[in-house]
Amino acid sequence: IFLVYGNKNFTRAKHAHKKCSQFIMPIHGKIELYCENKSLKFQKKLDYKKKEAYLIKPLTWCKIKFLTDYSILMVFCDQEYDFKDYIVKYKHFLKIIKKK
């Protein structure tokens, strides 16, 4: 479990995981989530007042934009931190999902 803090228009993530799933939920403020995997692309707004959350599965490219100042995002992971699990280059991510 970890927390991510951000102010309005601040962007985080911009990566995917090979094996790790992440359950994310704002505990203060609002975020906009941009996700892409082999089968779909979408964006979704999450608001802590509405108790909204989302499960990001492995091999899903994700970008998070904070929509309000003082936003806090709580992230639950099913794996311990391992930098080798990260896919940080979008072109590399596209090659990987094309093979699957």
Describe each model-derived feature in a short phrase:
Residues 1-54, 69-70, 76, 82-100:
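Non-catalytic, conserved peripheral segments adjacent to functional cores
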Residues 62, 71:
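Glycine-centered loop/turn positions within well-structured domains
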